[in-house]
Amino acid sequence: MSLTMRIFTASRNGQRLFGSHGARLLAAQRAEPKDIVEVPKGYVYVNNKELSMEFADITDRAASTMFFGELLRGFAVTLAHIFKEPATINYPFEKGPLSPRFRGEHALRRYPSGEERCIACKLCEAICPAQAITIEAEERADGSRRTTRYDIDMTKCIYCGFCQEACPVDAIVEGPNFEFSTETHEELLYNKEKLLCNGDKWESEIASNLQADHLYR
């Protein structure tokens, strides 16, 4: 019997080759389909089909490859977060920390003596981009000016903080309260009494926030 080996299959990447006597050889060089010496009857070379270079076939292969890769990446992200501590909190029973620069519900502040801080300069009214602030003022007997009307339409306010930045005496501020939803539109039309009440309620937190942020103001 001839010792000539009959190569049944050959890999493009030069993997294992099988002979008629069952010997297994490791190809050192790349084997192309044209290198096959003889294909016995009953055997079919299954890797002989060339990849189609049509645009539709190329896009299909690329989409399949990317989809499979993104699918594995998504699974990896999911598995990585399964064992991590949840980032959510049980609101409203739990609340996250707020920055000292947080811009919430508006308030008018007083001095420790109880005197209103606002000097009716109307800078906040002038700078408000939403035109949500309306101020009326009059002069007192001692020559100082104080507001007789200070209204804020909270439905117009965009919480930009310009009013607080423009105020020279830190009278109008945006406090730490963000839970002030209402059932009617009228409840969001704040007058001077409402704003002063907010200031009295949140004065301690407002003062500490202003102190914590004083280097950046």
Curated annotation (Swiss-Prot):
Transit peptide residues according to the UniProt entry: 1-26
Cofactor note: Binds 2 [4Fe-4S] cluster.
EC numbers on record: 7.1.1.2
UniProt binding sites for [4Fe-4S] cluster 2: C157, C160, C163, C167
Protein name as annotated: NADH dehydrogenase (ubiquinone) 23 kDa subunit
Family note: Belongs to the complex I 23 kDa subunit family.
Assembly information from the UniProt record: Part of the mitochondrial membrane respiratory chain NADH dehydrogenase (Complex I). This is a component of the iron-sulfur (IP) fragment of the enzyme.
Tissue specificity of this protein: Expressed in muscles (at protein level).
Cross-referenced NCBIfam families: NuoI, PRK05888.1-4, PRK05888.1-5
Residue intervals of the 4Fe-4S ferredoxin-type domain: 109-138, 148-177
Domain of life assignment: Eukaryota
Group of enzyme by EC: translocase
Origin species: Drosophila melanogaster
Binding site for [4Fe-4S] cluster 1: C118, C121, C124, C128
Necessary cofactors: [4Fe-4S] cluster
GO cellular component, one term: mitochondrion
Summary of the function given for this chain in its UniProt record: Core subunit of the mitochondrial membrane respiratory chain NADH dehydrogenase (Complex I) that is believed to belong to the minimal assembly required for catalysis. Complex I functions in the transfer of electrons from NADH to the respiratory chain. The immediate electron acceptor for the enzyme is believed to be ubiquinone.
Gene (UniProt): ND-23
Catalytic activities: a ubiquinone + NADH + 5 H(+)(in) = a ubiquinol + NAD(+) + 4 H(+)(out)
HAMAP family in UniProt: NDH1_NuoI
GO MF terms, alphabetically ordered: 4 iron, 4 sulfur cluster binding; metal ion binding; NADH dehydrogenase (ubiquinone) activity
GO biological process: mitochondrial ATP synthesis coupled electron transport; mitochondrial electron transport, NADH to ubiquinone; mitochondrial respiratory chain complex I assembly
Disrupted-gene phenotype: RNAi-mediated knockdown is lethal. RNAi-mediated knockdown in the muscles impairs biogenesis of the mitochondrial membrane respiratory chain NADH dehydrogenase (Complex I). RNAi-mediated knockdown in neurons impairs neuronal ATP production, reduces locomotor activity and shortens lifespan. In addition, results in large vacuoles in the retina, ommatidia disorganization and selective axonal alterations in mushroom bodies.
Keywords linked to the UniProt accession: 4Fe-4S, Electron transport, Iron, Iron-sulfur, Metal-binding, Mitochondrion, Oxidoreductase, Transit peptide, Translocase, Transport, Ubiquinone
Cellular compartments annotated: Mitochondrion
Pfam families: Fer4_7 (PF12838)
